[in-house]
């Protein structure tokens, strides 16, 4: 058997050094657990970065991939293939959206949404092109999406940024109104809850007020549901947590493919402005990835998985709040569904992640003073208890 050290040597020799990797060489996953090359197992409270909402190796997903691999993997979108179209129907039937285009990633999905917005501005708003986004957002790592992402540490090495985006404070309706310029602004792009920005949950009326403003100005109200979609916040799509909110354009990825590389941008009929030749993708919506996506979506919808996110998320937050009573440096517990963070008074998030690893828990330092949790939505309460016990042990060794 190739040793973990051998794999790490291969990585250091051949792979671009763009990621600071954690030590385990992971070889297998099942449910909420992953297993490394040395036989250790870990609770995965990252879910492959909010991708594996049904956990690792869910039987319905693995069976769908195995079955589709023996039929057809890939054809040009010039031809009809299945199960691309049934997956599109599941999305439309369970949302306020009318049209779907499949791509390969969240960044691609957001690029597509911005193309919709730009064309809307061209044909409806006399050439308006600017898109308002928010500080602490995250929309991807392409050139355009780095300009859309309102975090300087993602942007600074790539300046000058692509024009056409303006970043304003999140959860501030007036900031969006102030940034709007008639004849220039064509859309607003927001996350229902900011994930990479620190699990920032907006006030109850924020999204609705922004939507109403967009409609008043005839600009598109676009929601990036790459991290929040497919049940993570407690409803199939995150916006459904906020009464009266309906996106004109919505993007998806991560959990959409349940581990297969699949994204989508979706529109209401009135703003479905792309025509043949306006957009395309060689691999987007191929038979293999949409087979995985359709299988996962069916389980999520039919088995009421978003409800588990609500119930287990509330249980998990309660346990974390109890930890905060014991450890005074835990300043705040916040989140929605199973997208949760703890904020601390000290910059010890990285140390917490490092200390939790040998205890058997995978978590994420989303800010220097903040740890993020995004486990599979079918995580059990016993697994939550196990994770909290590990955190308690780690925090007990942290100076208040």
Annotate each predicted stretch with a short phrase.
Residues 1-400:
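Conserved N-terminal phosphate-binding loop of PLP-dependent enzymes in the Aspartate aminotransferase
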């Amino acid at each position: 058997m190739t040793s973990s050290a051998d794999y790490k040597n291969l990585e250091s020799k051949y792979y671009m050094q763009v990621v600071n990797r954690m030590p385990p060489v992971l070889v297998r996953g099942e449910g909420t657990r992953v297993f490394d090359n040395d036989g250790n197992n870990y609770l995965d409270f990252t879910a492959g970065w909010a991708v594996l909402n049904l956990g690792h190796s869910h039987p319905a997903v693995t069976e769908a991939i195995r079955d589709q691999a023996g039929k057809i993997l890939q054809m040009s979108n010039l031809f009809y293939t299945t199960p691309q179209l049934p997956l599109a129907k599941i999305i439309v039937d369970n949302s306020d959206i009318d049209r779907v285009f499949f791509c390969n990633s969240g960044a691609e999905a957001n690029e597509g949404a911005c193309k919709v917005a730009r064309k809307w501005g061209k044909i409806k708003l006399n050439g308006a092109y600017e898109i308002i986004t928010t500080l602490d957002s995250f929309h991807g790592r392409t050139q355009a999406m780095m300009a859309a992402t309102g975090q300087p540490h993602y942007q600074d090495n790539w300046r000058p940024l692509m024009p056409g985006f303006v970043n304003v404070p999140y959860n501030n309706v007036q900031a969006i109104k102030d940034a709007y310029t008639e004849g220039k602004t064509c859309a607003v792009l927001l996350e229902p809850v900011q994930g990479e920005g620190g699990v920032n949950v907006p006030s109850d009326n924020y999204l609705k007020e922004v939507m109403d403003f967009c409609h008043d100005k005839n600009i598109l109200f676009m929601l990036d549901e790459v991290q929040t979609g497919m049940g993570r916040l407690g409803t199939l799509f995150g916006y459904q947590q906020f009464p009266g909110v309906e996106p004109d354009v919505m993007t998806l990825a991560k959990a959409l493919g349940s581990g297969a590389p699949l994204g989508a941008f979706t529109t209401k009929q009135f703003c479905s402005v792309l025509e043949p030749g306006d957009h395309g993708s060689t691999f987007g919506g191929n038979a293999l990835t949409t087979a995985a996506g359709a299988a996962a979506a069916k389980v999520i919808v039919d088995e009421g998985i978003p409800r588990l996110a609500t119930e287990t998320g509330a249980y998990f937050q309660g346990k974390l709040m109890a930890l905060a009573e014991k450890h005074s440096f835990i300043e705040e517990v916040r989140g929605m569904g199973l997208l949760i963070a703890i904020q601390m008074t000290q910059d010890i998030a990285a140390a917490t992640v490092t200390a939790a690893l040998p205890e058997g828990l995978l978590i994420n330092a989303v800010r220097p003073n903040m740890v993020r949790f995004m486990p599979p939505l079918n995580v059990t309460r016993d697994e939550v208890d196990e994770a909290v016990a590990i955190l308690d042990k780690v925090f007990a060794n942290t100076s208040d």
